[in-house]
Amino acid sequence: MPLRVIPAARLLTLIPAFLAAGAVEAAAATARPNIIFLFSDDQTARAIGLENPEVITPNLDRLAREGVRFTHHYNNTAICMASRCSVLTGLFEHRHGCNFEHGDLQRRFLEQSYPVLLRRAGYYTGFAGKVGFDLKGEKFETLAGFFDQWAGGPGQTFYETEKNPGIAKYAARYPHSSRAYAAWAADFLTAAKASGKPFCLSISFKAPHLPFTPDPQDAKLYAGKTFTRPPNYGVEKGRHLSAHARTSRAATGYREWINAYDESAAAYYALITGVDAALGMIREALAREGLAENTVILYSSDNGYNMGAHGFGDKVLPYEEASKSPLIIHDPRLPAASRGRISTALTGQVDIAATVHAFAGVPAPGGIDGRSLLPLLDDPAGRVREAMPLFNYWGVSSAQSLAIVTPSWKYIFWAHGGDGLRPTEELFDLAKDPHEMVNVASDPRHAAALNEMRRRYDAELAAIAATRVEGHGYEKYPVLFSRTIPWTEKPAPEKGSTAKGKRKAGREEN
């Protein structure tokens, strides 16, 4: 879809003023929207007020009512490092190669990321918050040079503002980092306006990632409350699932969601309320600077979170709670009739970059996996794809998987055949069973659907073989994930990568 621009008649009336001010750049800046991308950490799709009234998110709710909310938004890899690189580049994990146990991001991929390309095209750019990855062979500080303003932090960053150098000066007023990032953003907006350029700002909050330590002013809103468990809550609601999933850290750790659900939910939701408050602060700053009417806001999260569904904590797994997160796109230039709509189209984290490029009118790199979502703003009932792959290339071999999701079905193949496990298929009728309570893979009534999803799976596996990046350990997956090659003919997993092996990443690593 073409980029929306100022009507020609109005633009003609502004030309004299532009010429007097020295013109062409100002006209281009006015025609191109400003773009803000806000990114939470570990926020599952139902953890906003419009999905769950127990979560206090008035600003997110308002953003959705004034924009378009996407209810089938998937994280192509449901873990932070890979997801963040997919957001920046528009590439699936096996194409950019960055994840735990697979390696750091190569510079050539960062140089084709949306912030770098928009800056090259004349945008004033800024980044604050958790980066979540390193550049291969380079110091972390190198990343700052790709932006006009920088307040990014290595590792997990901290909830305590004073411990994050890029925002430490805001600690006295905003001791918790979520609101401090909004204060930094307000100063960025002032500088961006003074630059005379359109801007692209990306903020990556730590919240609501573990450890659950919310701002006290948000925590008190949830103190002592009892929260509704999801329909698929608890270990008993996961007995029907593959034994492979039970070998992942989502099953073996994170027991707070089983042992102390209300306390965990209170802290988790309070952290999200803090991010919501930051969104409100940023929108107030946009209004003060006179930038609100030409600034697009996108909001999402790097992955979902299980919250005790099927007895799981954490993320990583391909089930709905871990693999889906919110996506809201707010374009103030949308006509009133197009606001407040809900799109059920399949979207993914790889689509963020393509969408930002389309808003900015800056061509996206050729061959990326993402697709622009701008057509869905005008037609939320439309589609940009028919199926979406979900990858887990990380962690114990027994819990790694490839899944395919369509608007109605999800197919998961658990390939591991060692450690007492057998390769297993799961098929869920998402239209009738959104909580994934019945695996219908062996039900002959669904044989046609199973065969179609197998076909899509095999095609995706062939694409992995054809497009994977070299040197990051993905060459084994076309064989390991094959449905047709017997387990006994596949290469043995590396030492320490099985369910009985040593886990390489702990609770706080990602």
Language-model regions, residue ranges each:
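N-terminal secretory signal peptides that target proteins for export/translocation
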Residues: M1-A8
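Bacterial N-terminal signal peptides
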Residues: A9-G22
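Bacterial Sec-dependent signal peptides at the C-terminal "C-region" and cleavage site
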Residues: A20-A31
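Active-site-proximal cap/lid insertion segments
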Residues: T30-P33, D42-V55, G155-R179, F188-G348, ...
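Loop/turn elements at helix/coil->beta-strand transitions in domains of secreted/extracellular proteins
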Residues: A31-I35, E66-T71, R120-G126, G145-D148, ...
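Active-site segment of extracytoplasmic enzymes that catalyze sulfate/phosphate-ester chemistry
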Residues: F37-F39, T44-F127, K136-G137, Q149-K163
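Polar, surface-exposed loop/tail segments
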Residues: T57-P58, V87, A121, K130, ...
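Low-complexity, glycine/alanine/valine/leucine- and proline-rich hydrophobic stretches
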Residues: S401-E425
